[in-house]
Amino acid sequence: MLSAAIVAGAVPGAAQAGPRFDYRQVFTTSAPGASTGIDTQILYKHPDDPDAKPIPVRQEVFTFPVGTRFDESVVPDCTVSDLQLQLQGVSACPAATWLGSGHGNTSMTGFPGAGENPVLVNAFDFGSDRFRVLGESEDLPLRFIAHGEGTGRTRTVDVPATPGGPPDGEGALRRVRNIFPPRSAGGRAAVRTPRKCPSSGTWTFKARLTFADGGVERNVHRMPCRRRARRGTAR
């Protein structure tokens, strides 16, 4: 499962910065072995000018900390076609299939003076470790669907090209903050944190992003986790 999300300005806190994107990804709890949500934040940047329209991203690959467990059976599947989801929007999927949403997400067209445009984002389970991310422009009658798939502790999202302006005729994601809240059913958790907090005191999240020009950039974010107190030695 994945995620991406936004705040006014750069990604806050101890985000890891690279030439093409700043990255922060965390669980919503620091407790080991607990049901958790996922909070993903990315600020996309052009490597030659951090204030310009970014080079469009084509694929996002997120690798979660060692020991992270996913349970596909917790959230029901939204099985409508991509076309129906695009035409009908959020209402096409049953509420129980919703995974999470964007908070302050934006994109850029590249047209002079256009700046950043708000994007509404909602994600739905699609079954068989797959999910779909529905993006909707707040200013234009435009919806797009990004397909995601999970393998082990890795989640991959393929981002479609969208219409835009110069220099490439495409739109580009700028700010992303996607929050997937915790989900559980019958003692099962859709996502569960690793059983242990390692001796480093942090869990490591990794991102590998591929861009329209063929560029690939990797980044890492380390989240503090809660170590269990050692039992006292009996005398």
Describe each PLM feature range.
Residues 1-5:
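Sec-dependent N-terminal signal peptides
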Residues 6-15:
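C-terminal segment of classical bacterial N-terminal signal peptides
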Residues 16-235:
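Ser/Thr/Pro/Gly-rich, low-complexity intrinsically disordered stalk/linker tracts of secreted
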